[in-house]
Amino acid sequence: MSDFNLVGVIRVMPTDPDVNLDELEEKLKKVIPEKYGLAKVEREPIAFGLVALKFYVLGRDEEGYSFDEVAEKFEEVENVESAEVETVSRI
């Protein structure tokens, strides 16, 4: 983890409130490219029973790292409505 100097927060919205979040979280973890790390995943209640997953993805401030790349990978996963990079910060 010491090689990483950025953290990007990516909010993933499931397609509906009935999606099994545990299964979705595991599927999403598997599509994160190897060069990135994962600090943690949080759940954020939105409305009407819908809960977003917030992935804290670790990367480097150098060419070849883009948190948008990870968000695009997330959007390809079944039961994902959207994935959006909320913030990127230095660590």
Curated annotation (Swiss-Prot):
Pfam families: EF1_GNE. Keywords: Elongation factor, Protein biosynthesis. GO terms for molecular function: translation elongation factor activity. SMART domains: EF1_GNE. InterPro entries: eEF-1beta-like_sf (IPR036219), EF1B_bsu/dsu_GNE (IPR014038), Transl_elong_EF1B/ribsomal_bS6 (IPR014717), Transl_elong_EF1B_B_arc (IPR004542). CDD domains: EF1B. SUPFAM superfamilies: eEF-1beta-like. Promotes the exchange of GDP for GTP in EF-1-alpha/GDP, thus allowing the regeneration of EF-1-alpha/GTP that could then be used to form the ternary complex EF-1-alpha/GTP/AAtRNA. Belongs to the EF-1-beta/EF-1-delta family. This is Elongation factor 1-beta. It comes from Pyrococcus horikoshii (strain ATCC 700860 / DSM 12428 / JCM 9974 / NBRC 100139 / OT-3).
